[in-house]
């Protein structure tokens, strides 16, 4: 039995229906009952849910709880206990039976009208009085207060009012609605003009149309669902409900077409009606007027009270606001509301602290306004086709989706340290007003409190403009700030709760902690915790602690840099590193420390590397303590730093000298450089344990106490607070180069000095690593890589892994290999969206646009070399004039290279440093070449726009953008194929293929991304052994409180097909809606923005500058480039002059010796020097010590014989004798000539070279630098032509191969026989048991055959031979058969191979007679060897304990394993062809296999370069690699 079957079980006996109201009238205790209801309501008040604007609900939970009292008061039934609808139905029947009721009396059928009167809740809501916090019209404004009202009477009024408003949507000429609420007479009338109701008889029902629609249930003009309507009526109840719940209901209709006036009166709850009165009507205006007298007794009312009138008046104002073109009047007073925006202002009338309201008319069907919620609780006032949806619905969720998403992105961006803010949390801080027109709306019930229509059926979309969203996000709105404030409060509360049980403990168990013995005890204040930078530093500290003792000193290694805890509360909770430190020290969040006795340690010592990153770690620790426990920093001696030397110098047996700062060492080196050996201590790991003990033995000398000062608070916040990024820019700009912190001998250090003199150096270095230089467009890591490639003259491919090592060694790169790997890969990538000019050549898989380069191979698999175009960009002739950086005491990369065009605009950049970030798009190098030519000619530069190599889409200026600086729109390419199909052949810049596939999956199946994210979090949590955190919050039953507020809410894509390759884009998409009805570019994200608003770079002086336009950047670059062309010309001219003089003097010298004018044998060197001076030979000292390595290689290449090599090599020996005086050095180029070069032939050749140099010199002097520049531009343009030809060849190759290759699938796999299927089922792999039988010994072979008989559990095989017919499959070793082994072949050719080597060129072949076959046990082991393990080279053959790894032997080579003589037990190895994963474990006594030696390891050419040279080319054209 269902609940519905018992709906009428509480009725009094009798089949005739009696009005419950009449019974209520006759009841003498009616007023008392009403009073008791109020009292009951008051007692339940504290438990009631707090009402808001959202909950202007006419049906509350209290309705159900009050129903029993209502039933008791309204009905005189005997069984009061059975009056509740929620009572058990069987109890009701049993109770009724006891009272003598028959089955007919228990089960009743009611007419619909009677059922409506009996159960009004379904149709109009409760008929009982209730109290709620609602908006009402009072004192000429909207007021939010507690209201006592009956929802039912409110609803019947609303039905008549909405009917009038619906006429506006049906009839556009409607002009007014007049509402009269007569409190004295107890009636309400609603009048509207517009198209009237036809006054004629319905042909089917034989009654007039007005009577049909106002006096008969289930009549409506809205039953045709194929018709798109924007009205509120739907179910055929509407106005009839007002008639049913009224004592009198008067209908008055004027029809100008039929010239009739219709008037009819209904009474007795629509049961009685008068005949219609039809009179003549001559007016041209149609109208409809409904007047009704609510049955107040039914609603427990005597009159229209103040609360009801205020509530009904508010609904009249609602209608006026939703229909601003209508003249709406209330009690003959026109309201004068002409827009929805003005209606909204009624809620905030001239308040001093009124929040700013942001309104937008999105379209003809959507109006939207958003403001900050004062109560931090979501409020909404919404209307659907003039119906007030007090509980919101899908329209509110849809209207807010874009806004909430934008706020969420903004908040999460500013609140990076905390957990992502959920949409529901954001909505709690919003108040929203929505007015919309929805086609054929669906509601949760007849009360129409919640819209339930699907968004796809709305007939329109609410898409607020970017301008509106930006206004909402503006700081003036206070929305983002309010959300951030509450989020931080929430995080801080969670943080405080997370360590509520912390504090001082005797012992703690934390991995890698070496706890002090007295820590946590009574003497804990005397203990010191040493935080070290990594494990290696901890070992140094441990060695030192052995000197001072473990009682008072503990050590704990940090994994790396600590988290910046400011605004990072949620991350702090989940940060193991910080939690460990808090536990070790015994700290508690939120506690103010006045003494150190509550801690496990009284001192915190920081021991980090003496470099920039070490300074940063110190700062982060200071920041953490200052943020959570600032009073600890004020306690003298709590925070201490341990300093170690950064440089030590050694000389013979003298005592080493230590330096603790680089400026200090450089100052010393100016006067004390000779004879000293220098050792750089970049990390603590450089120090030996012995040195560590020395440091700790003189602890007072190596520690510095931090001291609180007046400016400490401000300076620490300056360095680490996110809100002070602009202050940090000024802070770094004001730093004076050369300023350093004196450490050695200092006992105390103020926090301000540390921040302003030490930490600032890290911030500057961080920017140098992250932000490129305007001159060469390179960051430091890119410059070091390019320098190393030029130094090595990298013309032949080497592995990236090798290049990483080379760069680290030769450019003093001090960071991780992973960072350098990403740098090298990034310089070589050439897919769309990466480089316009890739300086390195990608030989291997360097990533594609499928994953944006993330799909690149490991460094050990890919190769690279210098790209041919690199030297066209960075000309070799500029190398000698560059100023180099000195690192670790040697010259490394230049401060900047000087390219032919501004490379900063060619490949762009993205970088984030301290206080600064930089984002520069890519531009066409040909445009830059053209602009440089214009600049050479003194003409103005042409504007350029972003350009990306290989991109087929369009990049256009965003004309509507109000962003300061240039903004462009990058658009993909799409084409309509049919009504519901289109194709995409290009994506906007930065949108990778894999990401786009995920977007299409989301558009096809909404929620896909969320599901993948949850799965990823679950996997990550399972690896850590923790529970995955829920990604969704608890959902509310209310539609507009739904937390799942994602951008994609409904499916748009029916299906799609992906034809994209690694370099091209091609998707064919089938849509659910017609293509023409979809905003393809927006929905499918085929447009992205490219900004020129953050072009930040270092200039040539090392200062950070921001450029507003690309033209300004080019104008800054050009004079710098011209200046360096002049420097290049001057240098080359000086060098040619020197070479001319050198060749002339050499020719004269050789000629003088040959003619015996100069005697060089048996002469003192001093006399020889004087003779050379007398003969006026030029003294030539190599001033241009920083010579181009390119010239050296060129000369070596041109040395055709030993004499040429000897003459050219003398230049490299200039200055080799450091102890010589200047006179001797000046003539070394002559005196170092070999004797066998002093010939007349050599004189002739030298004169020819001299004349050639003179000609070259003259040409150089006569060529303007502008002409030199143009030649370089021409050369670069030619290189670009070659690059374009290369790109085209790749494209043509693909097309050519596609034409030659027929597109077809692989042949289908063949079916297997039934016997094989049966065998497979009988012996499934899952049931296999690994055989483990001991290896037989020689003694076992002599056992009688009966003893060696195979049992059911023993596996036996025949001896493996070279004959394929005797080779058994692996299944034979698992088969339970007892077959005799096949006799072995008498002779066998044995081949020994190294299965691990790819170089098995030497094969040992032996032919030995075989002994009779003997049963030998095998141990077969299944291996799950990974690809990585198989890549490693190992000598398994020499290790009898380790099983050999299987590897496929080279083709056409036998793979039989050699065996021992018959006297020993034979080891048999099975050639398993069934599985690559099964590895055969050889017996312990297997014979030694012949092993082919590996090829000689490759090594770099030795470098004995001059430190004075920019490059020492280690790789000539005949590179051995």
From Swiss-Prot:
* Key word Isomerase present: yes
GO molecular-function terms, A-Z: ATP binding; DNA binding; DNA topoisomerase type II (double strand cut, ATP-hydrolyzing) activity; metal ion binding
UniProt site (Interaction with DNA) = 561, 564, 728-729, 779, 813, 819, 992
Q: Where is this site: Important for DNA bending?
A: 912
Superkingdom of origin organism: Eukaryota
Tell me the compartments it is located in. Nucleus
Per UniProt, where does Mg(2+) 2 bind? Answer: 609, 611
| The Toprim domain, residue ranges | 527-640
Which family does this protein fall into?
Belongs to the type II topoisomerase family.
Subunit architecture: Homodimer.
Name this protein carries in UniProt = Probable DNA topoisomerase 2
Give the source species: Dictyostelium discoideum (Social amoeba)
């Amino acid at each position: 039995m269902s609940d519905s079957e018992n709906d009428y079980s509480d009725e009094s006996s009798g089949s005739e229906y009696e009005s419950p109201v009449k019974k209520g009238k006759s009841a003498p205790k009616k007023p008392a009952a009403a009073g008791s209801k109020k009292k009951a309501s008051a007692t339940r008040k504290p438990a009631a849910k707090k009402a808001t604007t959202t909950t202007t609900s006419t049906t509350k939970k209290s309705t159900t709880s009050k129903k029993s009292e209502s039933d008791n008061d309204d009905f005189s039934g005997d069984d009061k206990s059975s009056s509740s609808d929620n009572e058990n139905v069987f109890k009701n029947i049993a109770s009724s039976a006891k009272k003598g009721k028959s089955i007919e009396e228990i089960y009743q059928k009611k007419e619909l009208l009677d059922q409506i009167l009996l159960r009004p809740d379904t149709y109009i809501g409760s008929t009982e009085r209730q109290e709620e916090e609602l908006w009402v019209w009072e004192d000429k404004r909207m007021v939010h207060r507690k209201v006592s009202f009956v929802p039912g009477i409110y609803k019947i009024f609303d039905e008549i009012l909405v009917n009038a408003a619906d006429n506006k949507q049906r009839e556009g000429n409607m002009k007014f609605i007049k509402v009269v609420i007569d409190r004295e007479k107890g009636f309400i009338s609603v009048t509207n003009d517009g198209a009237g109701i036809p006054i004629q008889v319905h042909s089917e029902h034989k009654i007039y149309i007005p009577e049909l629609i106002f006096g008969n249930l289930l009549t409506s003009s809205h039953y045709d669902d194929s018709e798109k309507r924007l009205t509120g009526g739907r179910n055929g109840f509407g106005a009839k409900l007002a008639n049913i719940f009224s004592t009198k209901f008067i209908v008055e209709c004027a029809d100008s077409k039929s010239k009739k006036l219709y008037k009819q009166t209904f009474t007795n709850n629509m049961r009685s009606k008068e005949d219609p009165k039809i009179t003549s009507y001559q007016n041209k205006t149609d109208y409809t007027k409904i007047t009704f007298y609510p049955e107040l007794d039914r609603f427990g009312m005597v009159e229209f009270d103040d609360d009801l009138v205020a509530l009904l008046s508010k609904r009249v104002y609602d209608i006026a606001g939703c229909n601003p073109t209508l003249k709406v009047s209330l009690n003959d007073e026109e309201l004068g509301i002409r827009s929805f925006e003005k209606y909204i202002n009624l809620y905030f009338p001239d308040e001093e602290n009124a929040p700013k309201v942001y309104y937008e008319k999105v379209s003809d069907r959507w109006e939207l306004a958003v403001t900050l919620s004062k109560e931090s609780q979501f409020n909404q006032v919404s209307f659907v086709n003039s119906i007030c949806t007090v509980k919101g619905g899908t329209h509110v969720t849809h209207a807010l989706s874009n806004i909430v998403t934008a706020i969420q992105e903004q908040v999460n961006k500013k609140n990076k340290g905390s957990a992502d803010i959920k949409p529901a949390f954001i909505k709690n801080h919003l108040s929203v007003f929505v007015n919309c027109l929805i086609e054929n709306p669906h509601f949760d019930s007849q009360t129409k409190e919640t819209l339930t229509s699907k968004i796809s059926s709305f007939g329109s979309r609410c898409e607020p403009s970017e301008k509106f969203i930006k206004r909402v996000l503006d700081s003036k709105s206070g929305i983002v700030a309010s959300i951030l404030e509450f989020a931080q409060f929430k995080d801080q509360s969670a943080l405080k709760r997370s360590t509520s049980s912390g504090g001082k403990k005797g012992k703690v168990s934390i991995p890698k902690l070496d706890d002090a013995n007295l820590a946590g005890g009574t003497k804990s204040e005397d203990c010191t915790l040493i935080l070290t930078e990594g494990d290696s530093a901890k070992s140094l500290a441990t060695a030192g602690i052995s000197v001072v003792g473990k009682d008072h000193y503990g050590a704990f290694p940090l994994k790396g840099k600590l988290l910046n805890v400011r605004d990072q509360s949620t991350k702090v909770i989940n940060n193991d590193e910080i939690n460990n430190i808090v536990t070790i020290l015994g700290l508690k969040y939120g506690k103010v420390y006045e003494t150190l006795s509550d801690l496990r340690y009284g001192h915190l010592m920081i021991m980090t590397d003496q470099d920039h990153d070490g300074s940063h770690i110190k700062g982060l620790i200071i920041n953490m303590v200052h943020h959570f426990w600032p009073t600890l920093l004020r306690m003298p001696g709590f925070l201490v730093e341990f300093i170690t030397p950064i440089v030590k110098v050694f000389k013979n047996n003298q005592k080493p000298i230590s330096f603790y700062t680089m400026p200090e060492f450089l100052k010393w080196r100016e006067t004390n450089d000779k004879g000293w050996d220098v050792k750089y201590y970049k990390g603590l790991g450089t120090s030996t344990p012995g040195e560590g003990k020395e440091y700790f033995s003189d602890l007072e000398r190596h520690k510095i106490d931090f001291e609180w000062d007046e400016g400490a608070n401000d300076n620490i916040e300056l360095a680490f607070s996110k809100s002070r990024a602009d202050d940090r820019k000024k802070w770094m700009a004001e730093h004076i180069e050369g300023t350093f912190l004196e450490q050695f001998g200092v006992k105390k250090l103020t926090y301000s000095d540390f921040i302003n003199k030490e930490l600032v150096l890290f911030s500057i270095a961080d920017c140098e690593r992250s932000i490129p230089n305007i001159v060469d467009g390179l960051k430091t890591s890119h410059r070091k890589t390019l320098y190393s490639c030029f130094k090595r003259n990298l013309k032949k491919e080497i592995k990236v892994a090798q290049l990483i090592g080379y760069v680290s060694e030769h450019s003093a790169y001090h960071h991780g290999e992973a960072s350098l790997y990403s740098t090298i890969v990034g310089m070589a990538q050439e897919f769309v969206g990466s480089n316009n000019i890739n300086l390195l050549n990608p030989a291997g898989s360097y990533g594609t646009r499928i994953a944006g380069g993330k799909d690149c191979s490991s460094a050990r698999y890919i190769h690279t070399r210098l790209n041919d175009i690199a030297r066209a960009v960075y000309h070799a002739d500029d190398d000698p004039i560059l100023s180099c950086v000195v690192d670790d005491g040697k010259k490394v990369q230049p401060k900047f290279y000087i390219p032919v065009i501004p490379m900063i605009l060619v490949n762009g950049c993205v970088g984030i440093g301290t206080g600064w970030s930089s984002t520069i798009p890519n531009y066409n190098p040909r445009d830059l070449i053209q602009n440089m030519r214009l600049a050479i000619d003194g003409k103005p530069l042409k504007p350029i726009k972003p350009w990306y190599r290989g991109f087929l889409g369009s990049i256009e200026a965003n004309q509507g953008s109000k962003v300061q600086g240039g903004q462009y729109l990058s658009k993909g390419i799409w084409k309509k194929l049919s009504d519901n199909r289109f194709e995409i052949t290009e994506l906007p810049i930065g949108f990778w293929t894999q990401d786009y596939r995920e977007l299409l999956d989301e558009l096809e199946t909404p929620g896909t991304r969320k599901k993948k994210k949850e799965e990823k979090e679950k996997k990550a949590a399972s690896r850590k052994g923790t529970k995955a955190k829920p990604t969704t919050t608890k959902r509310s039953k209310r539609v507009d409180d739904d937390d799942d507020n994602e951008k994609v809410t409904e499916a748009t894509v029916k299906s799609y097909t992906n034809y994209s390759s690694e370099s091209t884009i091609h998707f064919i998409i089938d849509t659910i809606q017609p293509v023409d009805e979809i905003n393809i570019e927006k929905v499918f994200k085929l447009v992205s923005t490219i900004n020129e608003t953050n072009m930040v770079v270092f200039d040539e002086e090392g200062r950070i500058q921001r450029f507003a336009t690309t033209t300004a950047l080019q104008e800054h670059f050009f004079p710098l480039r011209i200046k360096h062309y002049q420097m290049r010309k001057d240098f080359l001219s000086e060098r040619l002059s020197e070479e001319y003089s050198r060749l002339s003097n050499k020719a004269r010298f050789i000629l003088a010796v040959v003619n015996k004018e100069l005697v060089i044998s048996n002469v003192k060197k001093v006399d020889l020097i004087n003779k050379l001076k007398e003969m006026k030979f030029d003294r030539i000292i190599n001033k241009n010590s920083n010579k181009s390595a390119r010239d050296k290689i060129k000369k070596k290449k041109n040395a055709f014989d030993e004499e040429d090599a000897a003459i050219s090599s003398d230049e490299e020996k200039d200055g080799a004798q450091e102890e010589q005086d200047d006179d001797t050095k000046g003539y070394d180029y002559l005196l170092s000539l070999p004797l066998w070069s002093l010939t007349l032939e050599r004189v002739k050749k030298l004169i020819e070279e001299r004349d050639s140099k003179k000609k070259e010199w003259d040409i150089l002097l006569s060529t303007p630098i502008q002409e030199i520049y143009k030649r370089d531009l021409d050369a670069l343009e030619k290189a670009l032509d070659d690059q374009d030809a290369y790109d085209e060849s790749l494209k043509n190759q693909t097309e050519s191969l596609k034409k030659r290759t027929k597109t077809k699938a692989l042949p289908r796999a063949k079916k297997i026989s039934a016997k094989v299927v049966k065998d497979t089922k009988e012996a499934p792999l899952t049931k296999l048991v690994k055989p483990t039988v001991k290896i037989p010994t020689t003694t076992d072979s002599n056992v009688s055959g009966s003893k060696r008989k195979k049992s059911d559990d023993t596996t036996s095989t025949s001896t493996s031979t070279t004959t394929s017919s005797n080779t058994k499959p692996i299944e034979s070793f698992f088969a339970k058969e007892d077959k005799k082994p096949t006799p072995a072949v008498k002779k066998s050719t044995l081949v020994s191979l190294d299965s691990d080597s790819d170089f098995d060129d030497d094969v040992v072949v032996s032919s030995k007679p075989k002994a009779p076959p003997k049963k030998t046990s095998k141990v077969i082991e299944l291996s799950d060897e990974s690809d990585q393990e198989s890549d490693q080279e190992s000598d398994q053959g020499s290790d009898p304990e380790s099983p050999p790894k299987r590897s496929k032997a080279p083709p056409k080579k036998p793979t039989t394993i050699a065996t021992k003589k018959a006297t020993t037990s034979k080891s048999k190895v099975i050639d398993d062809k069934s599985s690559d994963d099964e590895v055969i474990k050889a017996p312990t006594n297997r014979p030694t296999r012949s092993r082919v030696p590996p090829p000689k390891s490759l090594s770099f050419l030795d470098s004995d370069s001059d430190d004075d040279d920019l490059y020492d080319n280690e790789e000539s054209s005949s590179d051995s690699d």
